[in-house]
């Protein structure tokens, strides 16, 4: 039978070596006297041989474009070969040959005498005399002797043996060169001779010495074979993700869960693991390993993962496996954010190492093995994610049929989520507009400036007592006198204040816990700041302030329907029982169609695959929108603040909470010389509050209002002018309590209230050392958890508010209406699945 010669991209997976890198190869079919084989000739000179007779489990051929096909060949030991970029003619020829071999229509001439059992493992070509004698039965003819794979070894042979074996190899390849010369007429094989020359220039000869040990004559290439985890940047030629290579893309994202069963926690297979992940989320309390001073990275990732709307916005729009970033940092970052609960600790460690290696490109401040600031890393992540989203989305929308995303766009053409108007996850959840106004005290000329922001950085007032997050925020928005020369009257004193032009879903408050002493040495500010459960922003908004984007249908869940095309890309991969011992445990969950069986009963329709188009409102507020408001806002500011404070007068809880927080501070204080490990353990084992009564437990879902402002602090924003003096007088008056309001009750009619969902804490008394941990509210389990690298512990909600007064550094507050709606949807989803 005439051999078939095909040029294509090939990729192999085996249980021992994992997934190889996708490489260009010449594929030859060979029917010998004893075996039917596929021979793969790589451009590097390597040769691999794959035995086919009585060794084929399945053959799948798929078409994904005009004259573009891929073939998935699975062997009986569950190794597989993935061949892509096949023309229609070549694909049909190869498929026909493999089908006939599988059905027994094509058999070796003497199949009963073939040596060895069917296997996909590659054989080596031994050139020494003793080796040839040993393997003479296998290599009877020059043609069969060429069916081998060269393995790279570390030792060198003697010169005499080297010459003997090189001569042997030259004789063996004479016929092959003659055979290849007949292919010159085929334009698709124009580079064949170059490949042969490359092969002969990089021969690897394996010999046996007197002790039977194999030695290497010359390595094929310097680099290691293309096996291992695909996320590691082992290949300099890979400047980014080539999304046209579908299997490579799957490998880059899902190989740890699709292909390597030992990467799954508790030995579960992919289907079982996804079933557990969907139905029993309480089993997935996963932390992140510390790979060397990376606690600041871990707390930021855990904090972002605690905002389900943000993660779902990434996932449901196909980031990163459909719309893949082109750089390592954003690719790895998105993988950890979206698939953190699927990857096990070992693989999360590899991703974190990749992130740390990619960080130095953003500046020396993020050098490897260096302690860094969590807030700076959070800011970097938000900026990079937004820029990457905009860049990839623009490429997705603008590329034509020849672009990198053409194939993926065709596959996901029926998925409305992917093709709807894009919504940036950062803009949609964290970004807000801050309107700054500068009012001239002489002529009244007002300047307006609106700028988007993703967080508020707030100073801790000097000399303040019984301060809270709410009071420091109010002070930030209070009127402030500054020196600013008026363009109209040239007067150099003005009053400035801020207002929200657009509110976010989640507002991030960064508390500046550092100050400079007399020697200009930066010190950590450990003064207790009471953690407010609720933030009230109504007094800092105007009538034109835009509300945060509302929840869209299905936004509260990950749209797992987007995983269905993986079946099209490699359905056989998902069905393979890679470990026969575990096969029995995967019954009833054979494919990645998550919406089958039990989930269909669990109201699978709630996983809506179509997300309504709702482009984030752009900041188009101009002078016409704010000019008529700011003038009156300046004169009414103090009256509004006074009225607001009188309605929400703090009770005796404030002073008591501060005293109690000071006790917690003594328990969690750390010496600067202690190690991160000691600090981490102390942070998790420090004393918890005593059990609280049922009545108090019910009140935890309501407000613990903390709303104070000292007269000396408010007077800092005043001046000798009459206007600012009146502001100070009014601000002083609000510090005098007039009536008590139950801090555990929230006014249902109150607008623009935000609720705490996450805190990043810094443990230690120096800004240049210590350890980061974070407390996060889990919507699925409806409980608070403390994350310290890999350690995850459940904590009491009351402790979060009272015990983090001196360690709280970055605070995440979610709009209360969105919080309640999201919580209700999660509760309904949980009860439905249990029912």
UniProtKB/Swiss-Prot annotation:
Subcellular localization: Nucleus; Cytoplasm, Cytoskeleton, Flagellum axoneme
Claim: Cell inner membrane is one of the keywords in the record: no
Catalysis performed (reactions): Thiol-dependent hydrolysis of ester, thioester, amide, peptide and isopeptide bonds formed by the C-terminal Gly of ubiquitin (a 76-residue protein attached to proteins as an intracellular targeting signal)
Pfam family, one: UCH
Biased composition (Polar residues): 118-128, 683-708
Gene Ontology biological process: negative regulation of proteasomal ubiquitin-dependent protein catabolic process; protein deubiquitination; proteolysis; regulation of androgen receptor signaling pathway; spermatogenesis
Entry EC number(s): 3.4.19.12
PROSITE patterns associated with the record: USP_1, USP_2, USP_3
A single GO cellular-component term on record: cytoplasm
Main location: nucleus
Residue stretches of biased makeup (Basic and acidic residues): 634-652, 669-679, 726-747
InterPro entries, alphabetized: Papain-like_cys_pep_sf, Peptidase_C19, Peptidase_C19_UCH, USP37-like_PH, USP37-like_PH_sf, USP_CS, USP_dom
Annotated spans, Disordered: 102-128, 597-747
Biased composition (Low complexity): 709-725
Domain of life: Eukaryota
Residue numbers annotated as active site: 295 (nucleophile), 771 (proton acceptor)
UniProt keyword terms in alphabetical order: Cell projection, Cilium, Cytoplasm, Cytoskeleton, Flagellum, Hydrolase, Nucleus, Protease, Thiol protease, Ubl conjugation pathway
Residue ranges occupied by any USP domain in the UniProt entry: 286-816
Coiled coil regions, renumbered to chain: none
GO MF: cysteine-type deubiquitinase activity; K48-linked deubiquitinase activity
Similarity field: Belongs to the peptidase C19 family.
Quaternary structure and partners: Interacts with RING1.
Function recorded in the entry: Deubiquitinase regulating several biological processes through the deubiquitination of components of these processes. Involved in somatic cell reprogramming through the 'Lys-48'-linked deubiquitination and stabilization of CBX4 and CBX6, two components of the polycomb-repressive complex 1 (PRC1). Also deubiquitinates and probably stabilizes the androgen receptor (AR), regulating the androgen receptor signaling pathway. May play a role in spermatogenesis.
Protein name in the entry: Ubiquitin carboxyl-terminal hydrolase 26
Protein species of origin: Mus musculus (Mouse)
Organism phylogeny: Eukaryota, Metazoa, Chordata, Craniata, Vertebrata
């Amino acid at each position: 039978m005439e051999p078939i010669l095909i040029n294509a991209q090939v990729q192999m997976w085996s249980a021992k070596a994992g997934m190889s890198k996708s490489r260009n190869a010449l594929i030859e079919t060979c029917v010998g006297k004893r075996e039917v084989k596929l021979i793969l000739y790589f451009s590097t000179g390597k040769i691999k041989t794959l035995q086919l007779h009585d060794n084929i489990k399945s053959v799948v051929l798929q078409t994904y474009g005009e004259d573009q096909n891929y073939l998935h060949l699975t062997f009986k030991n569950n190794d597989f070969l993935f061949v892509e970029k096949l023309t229609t003619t070549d694909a049909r020829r190869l498929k026909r040959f493999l089908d006939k071999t599988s059905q027994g229509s094509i058999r070796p001439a003497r199949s009963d005498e073939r040596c060895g059992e069917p296997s996909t493992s590659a054989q080596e070509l031994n050139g020494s005399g003793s080796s040839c004698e040993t393997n003479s039965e296998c290599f009877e003819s020059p043609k069969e002797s060429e069916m081998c794979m060269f393995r790279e070894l570390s030792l060198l042979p003697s010169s005499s043996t080297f010459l003997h074996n090189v001569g042997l190899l030259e004789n063996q390849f004479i016929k092959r060169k003659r055979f290849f010369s007949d292919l010159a007429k085929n334009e698709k094989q124009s580079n064949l001779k170059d490949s042969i020359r490359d092969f002969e220039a990089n021969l690897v000869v394996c010999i046996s010495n007197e002790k039977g040990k194999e030695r290497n004559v010359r390595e094929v290439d310097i680099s290691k074979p293309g096996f291992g985890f695909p996320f590691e940047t082992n290949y300099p030629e890979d400047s980014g993700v080539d999304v046209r290579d579908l299997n490579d893309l799957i490998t880059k994202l899902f190989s740890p869960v699709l292909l390597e069963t030992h990467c799954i926690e508790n030995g579960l297979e992919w289907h079982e693991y996804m079933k557990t992940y969907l139905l029993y989320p309480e089993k997935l309390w996963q932390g992140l390993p510390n790979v060397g001073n990376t606690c600041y990275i871990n707390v930021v990732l855990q904090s972002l993962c605690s905002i389900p709307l943000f993660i779902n916005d990434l996932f449901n729009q196909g980031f990163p496996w459909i719309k893949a970033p082109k750089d390592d940092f954003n690719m790895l970052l998105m993988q950890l954010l979206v698939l953190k609960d699927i990857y096990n600790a070992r693989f999360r460690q590899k991703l974190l190492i990749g992130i740390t290696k990619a960080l130095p490109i953003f500046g020396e401040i993020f050098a490897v093995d260096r302690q860094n600031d969590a807030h700076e890393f959070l800011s970097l992540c938000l900026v990079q994610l937004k820029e990457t989203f905009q860049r990839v989305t623009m490429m997705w929308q603008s590329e034509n049929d020849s672009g990198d995303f053409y194939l993926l766009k065709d596959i996901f053409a029926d998925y409305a989520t992917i093709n709807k108007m894009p919504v940036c996850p950062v803009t949609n959840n964290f970004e807000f507009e801050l309107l700054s106004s500068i009012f001239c005290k002489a002529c009244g000329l007002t300047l307006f400036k609106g700028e988007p922001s993703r967080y508020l950085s707030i100073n801790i007032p000097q000399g303040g007592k019984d301060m809270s997050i709410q009071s420091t925020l109010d002070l930030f928005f209070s009127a402030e006198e500054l020196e600013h020369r008026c363009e109209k009257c040239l007067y150099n004193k003005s009053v400035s204040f801020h207002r929200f032009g657009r509110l976010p879903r989640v507002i991030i408050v960064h508390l500046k816990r550092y100050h400079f002493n007399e020697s200009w040495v930066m010190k950590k500010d450990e003064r207790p700041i009471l953690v407010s459960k609720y933030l009230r922003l109504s007094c800092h908004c105007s009538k034109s302030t835009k509300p945060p984007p509302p929840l869209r249908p299905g936004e509260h869940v990950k749209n797992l329907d987007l995983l269905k095309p993986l079946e099209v890309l490699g359905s056989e991969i998902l069905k393979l029982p890679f470990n026969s011992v575990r096969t029995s445990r995967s019954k009833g969950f054979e494919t990645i169609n998550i919406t089958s069986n039990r989930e269909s009963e669990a109201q699978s329709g709630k996983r809506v695959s179509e997300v309504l188009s709702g482009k984030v409102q752009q900041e188009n507020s101009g002078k016409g929108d704010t000019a008529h408001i700011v003038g009156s806002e300046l004169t009414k500011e103090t009256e509004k603040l006074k009225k607001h404070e009188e309605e929400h007068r703090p009770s005796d809880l404030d002073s008591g909470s501060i005293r109690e927080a000071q006790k917690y501070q003594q328990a969690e204080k750390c010496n600067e010389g202690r190690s991160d490990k000691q600090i981490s353990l102390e942070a998790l084992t420090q004393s918890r509050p005593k059990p609280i009564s049922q009545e108090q437990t019910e009140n935890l879902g309501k407000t613990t209002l903390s709303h104070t402002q000292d007269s000396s602090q408010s007077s800092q924003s005043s001046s000798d002018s009459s206007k600012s003096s009146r502001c100070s007088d009014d601000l002083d008056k609000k510090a005098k309590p007039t009536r008590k309001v139950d801090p555990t009750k929230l006014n249902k009619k109150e607008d623009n209230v935000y609720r705490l969902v996450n805190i990043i804490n810094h443990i230690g008394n120096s800004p240049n050392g210590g350890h980061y941990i974070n407390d996060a509210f889990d919507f699925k389990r409806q409980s608070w958890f403390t994350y310290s690298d890999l350690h995850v512990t459940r904590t009491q909600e009351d402790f979060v508010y009272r015990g983090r007064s001196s360690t709280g550094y970055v605070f995440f507050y979610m709009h209360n209406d969105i919080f309640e709606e999201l919580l209700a949807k999660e509760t309904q989803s949980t009860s439905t699945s249990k029912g």
